[in-house]
Regions:
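Short, mixed-charge low-complexity intrinsically disordered segments
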Residues: 30-62
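Short aromatic-glycine-(Arg/Gly/Cys) micro-motifs in beta-strand/loop hairpins
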Residues: 1-15, 41-45, 56
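A short, exposed loop/beta-hairpin motif centered on an aromatic-Gly-Thr core
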Residues: 11-27, 32
Length: 62
């Protein structure tokens, strides 16, 4: 299970949606980020690991 989490403030993240697959969670985060010009991240609920971060519609690549 994967969470889509929105950044409301520099130190405040709010869980918004849950998805069964990482791909669907990523597409949702990407779409919401482009539409709202906000930062979203996808987190794996099993390992509590961040799988991706999307800032203003652009993926962050590390």
């Amino acid at each position: 299970m994967y969470n889509v989490i929105k950044q409301e403030a520099p130190d405040r993240w709010v869980k918004e949606l849950y998805f069964q697959t990482e791909f669907r969670a990523y597409l949702c985060a990407l779409t919401k980020s482009k539409a709202l010009m906000a930062t979203y991240m996808v987190v794996d609920t099993d390992t509590n690991e961040v799988t991706s971060i999307v800032r203003h519609g652009k993926p962050l690549i590390s």
